[in-house]
């Protein structure tokens, strides 16, 4: 029995790279889509916000010295490419995915319209939110917090390469331990970088919990949705 009815899944662009230097690793994206398919079959409504670091990192050298707003718009376009790749992989897995973009690109994707997004979720479609918030200076983490609040998600699932929030960097400190649960205020006071400050504040103010878990760990997403001990829960 799922612990949540509607979730917002935040995928980083870097997670799509797999072991590649940049770009989209087909096997990796197919694995993610299979994980998403499993929770859709449980009756969970799934919305996705995707980053663009895997593509933008490939051109980041050329962005040195670039105006921040211009670089951010390039990043938004990178998320659009990832969203289309994710939608295509879903089609092959017989899941209906719909991309809604915060930037208008009408020949390619639908614009973001909140009531339509909610209706599509209720119809069992996976809604993929592209182009972040549509504004520069805001991260895709902030977009995840914003869209999660807008669609009435019960939780933001932040998929990373680490299986939760630790007392210290587990790669540098072998004695670091994983938090099972932690409050927003504790995470702030201990300077734990769960999300960027804007996204974190938005989730805290809206009382929207965050679950940090590993997307590369087999079956982790399903265990999170079933309410099992997986990852770290950040709550009010």
Swiss-Prot record:
Pfam families: AA_kinase. One of its GO terms (biological process) is UDP biosynthetic process. The keyword Secreted does not apply. ATP binds at residues 10-13, 53, 57, 160, 166, 169. Disulfide bonds: none annotated. Keywords: ATP-binding, Cytoplasm, Kinase, Nucleotide-binding, Pyrimidine biosynthesis, Transferase. One of its GO terms (molecular function) is UMP kinase activity. UMP binds at residues 52, 72, 133-140. It catalyses: UMP + ATP = UDP + ADP. Inhibited by UTP. It is found in: Cytoplasm. Its EC number is 2.7.4.22. Catalyzes the reversible phosphorylation of UMP to UDP. NCBIfam families: pyrH_bact (TIGR02075). This is Uridylate kinase.
